[in-house]
Amino acid sequence: MGGLHQGHARLIATAVTSCGGKGSVLVSTFVNPLQFGVDEDFDCYPRTFEDDCALAEQAGASALWCPDERQVYPYGTSEGWRLQAPARLTAHLCGPWRSGHFDGVVTVVMRLLGLVRPHQLWLGEKDWQQLTILRHLVNDFGLRVRVRGCPTVREGDGLAASSRNRYLGDAQRTVASAFSSALCATARDVCAGSVDEASAQVALRQQLREAGLEVEYVETVDPVTLQPARPGRSIRLLAAAVRCGETRLIDHVFIMTRSPIVAIDGPAGAGKSTVTRAFAERMGLLYLDTGAMYRAVTWWVQSNGADPSSAPAVEALLEGLEVDLSPLKDGVQTVRVNGRDITDAIRDPEVTGSVSLVAAHPCVRALLTKQQQRLGERGGLVAEGRDIGTAVFPDADVKVFLTATPEERARRRAKDLEARGHAVPDLAALEAQIVERDRLDSTREVAPLVQADDATELITDGMSIEAVIDALEDLFRFRVAKEIWPTPQG
């Protein structure tokens, strides 16, 4: 837009850091007429070109682009192409109060992306509804750009940084400062369980009015769908819009009742362990390798000479069995059974060949599911397996079904076996083994391999490991803002 402030400075600096000196950061300042209604502040919206140039340069921007209206809309705003944001994403929060606003946003951003063709699009989390709509835009149109978010920057009195803050006089500023503090206090009360959500919203409205603010809306919505939040969701968005005099202000907080849980399911050989381990390290999550736990039980059954297909024989070996997973260290997680390190042993082809048989026994699944759910009580983890999103953590915040074609998985399996020093069958034999294991996993009676209804399918054929991890991070950030789960530094 324009009227750059410290929130924009943080956004620019973060984008510069993400480039690592290998790219350029272009800052666009265009006051888009399509985003303003008839009685809104288009004519008086801050246009501070000299100050914007100085701020962008100091923050590390490579260039500042300040197009005029004809450059962006060569046929005029009434004759050119216009997009319409989906009604489901604009039915709540700012949508009903700013008719056509988000249509103007998606139209100008699509135009910007077409002209610039960036690799990344950096936006502030302050306007979460706008950020979410643009993430949907990029996903739905299959655009080759990553949408990245930057946490809300707050000024000294707690007010979210905004170009419109300069409209406020000293007295109004004092009144407006009650906005963010009231939101934060309400979120704390809801998280603590001292008040139910509906009552909290009523009380918040009253508190804002008593502070001298005119309330437009106070709503709690799902961060991804922007629809009223389903009871029991661990992460919800509490958002509000008020007017302080003639100045319209928006703000939000997240209500998070436990740390995030990510469930990654998929067939054997899809690369789940490799990418989930790296994703956990990137996002600061505990890595729960449930597949390794089933492999550990399989190894235990084989080492005791029991028949993996016999449920009574397997169940007899489970009493007192302890499977331990250590935290990741330099990308490696140690697996122990009753204190013995079997990290390498569980990757033996003999274990691989029997793990589906052992995992199909209800007694094994009951034991390990209970252990896994106990680890997940506080959240803050990512788990991968076959039934994480359907059986182990059905309330996971993010669910992904990671897969690849049997041909691709056979090639990956061959490389893994070769790297570990094992004999490598021909690709046709490996592919046949993979297809058979898929059949066993998907047809077993207890917790079969199926994609959860609310999971996102990610097909990884042709993708590098880094690209898959980026895709997982983007799915995570769709729901989990940096302001509530910052990306670890270093």
Curated annotation (Swiss-Prot):
Task: Name the GO terms of the biological process aspect.
Answer: nucleobase-containing small molecule interconversion; pantothenate biosynthetic process; pyrimidine nucleotide metabolic process
Encoding gene (name):
panC/cmk
Give the residues annotated as coiled coil.
Answer: none
By sequence similarity, the record places it as follows:
In the N-terminal section; belongs to the pantothenate synthetase family.
Residues annotated for beta-alanine binding in this entry = 35
What domain of life is recorded for the organism? Bacteria
**What's a Gene Ontology MF term here?**
ATP binding
* UniProt lineage: Bacteria, Bacillati, Cyanobacteriota, Cyanophyceae, Synechococcales
EC number of the protein: 6.3.2.1, 2.7.4.25
- What's this protein's function? Catalyzes the condensation of pantoate with beta-alanine in an ATP-dependent reaction via a pantoyl-adenylate intermediate. Catalyzes the transfer of a phosphate group from ATP to either CMP or dCMP to form CDP or dCDP and ADP, respectively.
Q: What is this protein called?
A: Bifunctional pantoate ligase/cytidylate kinase
User: Which NCBIfam families does the entry link to?
Assistant: cmk (TIGR00017), panC (TIGR00018), PRK13477.1 (NF010004)
Which Gene3D superfamilies does the UniProt entry name for this protein?
A: HUPs, P-loop containing nucleotide triphosphate hydrolases, Pantoate-beta-alanine ligase, C-terminal domain
